[in-house]
Amino acid sequence: MSKIIGIDLGTTNSCVSIMEGSQPKVLENAEGARTTPSVVAFTEDGEKLVGQPAKRQAVTNPENTIFAVKRLIGRSFEDPTVKKDIAAAPFKIVNSEKGDAWIEAKGEKYSPSQISAFILQKMKETAEKYLGQEVTKAVITVPAYFNDAQRQATKDAGKIAGLEVLRIINEPTAASLAYGLDKKQNKKIAVYDLGGGTFDVSILELGDGVFEVKSTNGDTFLGGEDFDNTIVDYLIGEFKKDSGIDLRSDKLALQRLKEAAEKAKIELSSAEQTDVNLPFITADKTGPKHINLKMTRAKLEALVEDLISRTLPPCKTALKDAGLTASEIDEIVMVGGMTRMPKVLSEVKNFFGKEPNKSVNPDEVVAMGAAIQAGVLQGDVKDVLLLDVTPLSLGIETLGGVSTKLIEKNTTIPTKKSQVFSTADDNQPAVSIRVLQGEREMASDNKMLGNFELVGIAPAPRGVPQIEVTFDIDANGIVSVSAKDKGTGKEQKIQIQASGGLSDEEIEKMVKDAEANKEEDKKKRESVDVRNQADTLLHSTEKNLKEHGAKVSDADKKAIEDASTDLKEAIKGTDTEEIKKKTETLVQASMKLGEAIYKSQEKKEGSPKEGDKNDEGKKDDNVVDADFEEVKEESKEGKEEDKEKSA
């Protein structure tokens, strides 16, 4: 049975984990790291890079290096948060045919699900290399506050990557699984999860293997990226004051600033001061310009104070929804790389009135929780029951543009709820069902997940027909809605897809593209290996011919030279099979040279001593083959004794 893997698909970094025995194990990628940057790049020569190799070349290729794509997944192009990203991102964010936010690189358009799929493929390959078998099933984490469209888009990404996503699990819930797996006592915990692009807070009750989410809240556009952007804005402002040059339109400079901002932010978690040093950031007619300034922790904290403060209202709401006060929380579990920042830790401590628990690795704990959930689904982990909730209320639009809720936020999932509605006009033949997600009273202020029509309603005065609307949320938090005319029995049912989400055909095409790319990548790798082999052979052959050419006939020498010339020509081209063929020809042609070198070496090492010259060529018919054993000489005397005996 193939192993189910757990994946934390993060904004900044991603991570993959499996269950080994009773414990989750985080796996190292090909570069030897336990986390992989969520970065995808398309290079000049058409190569696709994922992870650290993509991040390394970002400064020289900013327009085709895609990062933080999780902030775009499942969002429309017109979303105000997307507009903010368009202003900050060095790569191009474009409007898809259906109105979604997509990315353009090297003239090709990619959906955020596709870019995410490239990252998931890297996670899949990491697990396959470790396990030595194909992996086809996964549990993938998402921010607790992700809406239905974002969850669907994440599931689509898994499908494109060749994974059957058995469960979408909320990140704070996953973290609580990893934190509480071996803990037996009953506890009320808050999971404070501030990652690269999103913020979540969940309140849970843990006890006897039951992990029950009481409430969840958050902000899907608040994280380390915003902290980095704030530092970048500060650096741009300071540079403009000094030089009068605005760097905002310089994509190369922006990428360097972003890297410097991230580095400064990380360093200031342990140091009180750091230097931001960027030589040759730009130039004008007076010559090159440099950034060289000192940044203190106090300055950083002043810059990002508002961002940290934005995490506290969701904490208040989550506590209120759970019916608890801050003092009733036993532990605050810190998750996400941003929780290493001292100011974040002190704000959380002040809010909850106790020291946060830092016992878990904030970068790995979510993937570990996903692996535990995978273990539960596989039957390897017993006595663990996870009760999660829907983060946002679900309902439909009713007369006057009002949002009527059928399922309230923080309802335990899976769940199903029905309500009967009627027509607004006499003899109304059809009703349009607009499905909404959100907490606002008016439909227009909430997120419309989708709409469908129930037709064929029998003519009747308004208010008479009975239309039963049923909402069904599965364990992944994904919504299905049905409407049934109780009079005629006619029914219409849909699984909600984002209004601009990927169709099954588009997903299928992307799956095929991903497979084709995999084959293409293998071919490219093979081509590189074949060329390297050919280069090595040419180098060693030329060296040997120069040193030992006199040991072979002119005809053999010419055959080697001709084969070398042919191979050099083949390397200039793109035909891998031709290079293989010419390499083999040179190998065959060089054999005589190899034999000559070997014989010459043998002769040199095995030439007889002066005293034995007369015996050369004589054959002793009385010689008998015998087994012998090498004996280490113990002393000179022993050696002499042996000599006498043999005489």
From Swiss-Prot:
Residues 623-632 have a biased composition (Acidic residues). The modification Phosphothreonine is found at T198. Residues 514-529, 540-557, 600-622, 633-647 have a biased composition (Basic and acidic residues). InterPro entries: ATPase_NBD, Chaperone_DnaK, Heat_shock_70_CS, HSP70_C_sf, HSP70_peptide-bd_sf, Hsp_70_fam. Residues 514-557, 596-647 are annotated as: Disordered. One of its GO terms (molecular function) is ATP-dependent protein folding chaperone. Induction: By stress conditions e.g. heat shock. The keyword Nucleotide-binding applies. The keyword Nucleotide-binding applies. It comes from the Bacteria. Pfam families: HSP70 (PF00012). Keywords: ATP-binding, Chaperone, Nucleotide-binding, Phosphoprotein, Stress response. Acts as a chaperone. Belongs to the heat shock protein 70 family. PANTHER family: HEAT SHOCK PROTEIN 70KDA. This is Chaperone protein DnaK. It comes from Pelagibacter ubique (strain HTCC1062). The lineage of its organism: Bacteria, Pseudomonadati, Pseudomonadota, Alphaproteobacteria, Candidatus Pelagibacterales.
